[in-house]
Amino acid sequence: MARIAGVNIPNHKHTEIGLTAIYGVGRSRARKICEATGVPFDKKVKDLTDADLEKLRDEVGKVTVEGDLRRETTMNIKRLMDLGCYRGMRHRKGLPMRGQRTRTNARTRKGPRKAGVALKK
């Protein structure tokens, strides 16, 4: 298995698809990386030479991926929460922050339904 940016890339997949195993690399960025390095994107990962893998490692190293990207995303959300802006408050409350309705939907963000509390008579 090839190892790029601390991630094992599956051998049986095409280079373009295999690179998407790296957090922060999608299909379009994977294709751009392949074009920049001259590595054919439809070539299987197991057929790549060591020189090809080294080129890919160098090119992926220029992009913010994996732990750095996760840390950056977390810091951005924390900054919003510290500012006390609308989006930060919604993050803090665990609600959607892009204007979706929450009266009936938003179950993914709000979590499972809670049982209603019965009043004593």
From Swiss-Prot:
<protein>
    <recommendedName>
        <fullName>Small ribosomal subunit protein uS13</fullName>
    </recommendedName>
</protein>
<dbReference type="Pfam" id="PF00416">
    <property type="entry name" value="Ribosomal_S13"/>
</dbReference>
<keyword id="KW-0689">Ribosomal protein</keyword>
<dbReference type="InterPro" id="IPR019980">
    <property type="entry name" value="Ribosomal_uS13_bac-type"/>
</dbReference>
<keyword id="KW-0694">RNA-binding</keyword>
<dbReference type="InterPro" id="IPR018269">
    <property type="entry name" value="Ribosomal_uS13_CS"/>
</dbReference>
<dbReference type="GO" id="GO:0006412">
    <property type="term" value="P:translation"/>
</dbReference>
<comment type="similarity">
    <text>Belongs to the universal ribosomal protein uS13 family.</text>
</comment>
<dbReference type="InterPro" id="IPR010979">
    <property type="entry name" value="Ribosomal_uS13-like_H2TH"/>
</dbReference>
<keyword id="KW-0687">Ribonucleoprotein</keyword>
<comment type="function">
    <text>Located at the top of the head of the 30S subunit, it contacts several helices of the 16S rRNA. In the 70S ribosome it contacts the 23S rRNA (bridge B1a) and protein L5 of the 50S subunit (bridge B1b), connecting the 2 subunits; these bridges are implicated in subunit movement. Contacts the tRNAs in the A and P-sites.</text>
</comment>
<dbReference type="InterPro" id="IPR001892">
    <property type="entry name" value="Ribosomal_uS13"/>
</dbReference>
<dbReference type="GO" id="GO:0000049">
    <property type="term" value="F:tRNA binding"/>
</dbReference>
<dbReference type="GO" id="GO:0015935">
    <property type="term" value="C:small ribosomal subunit"/>
</dbReference>
<keyword id="KW-0699">rRNA-binding</keyword>
<keyword id="KW-0820">tRNA-binding</keyword>
<feature type="region of interest" description="Disordered">
    <location>
        <begin position="91"/>
        <end position="121"/>
    </location>
</feature>
<dbReference type="GO" id="GO:0019843">
    <property type="term" value="F:rRNA binding"/>
</dbReference>
<dbReference type="InterPro" id="IPR027437">
    <property type="entry name" value="Rbsml_uS13_C"/>
</dbReference>
<dbReference type="GO" id="GO:0005829">
    <property type="term" value="C:cytosol"/>
</dbReference>
<comment type="subunit">
    <text>Part of the 30S ribosomal subunit. Forms a loose heterodimer with protein S19. Forms two bridges to the 50S subunit in the 70S ribosome.</text>
</comment>
<dbReference type="GO" id="GO:0003735">
    <property type="term" value="F:structural constituent of ribosome"/>
</dbReference>
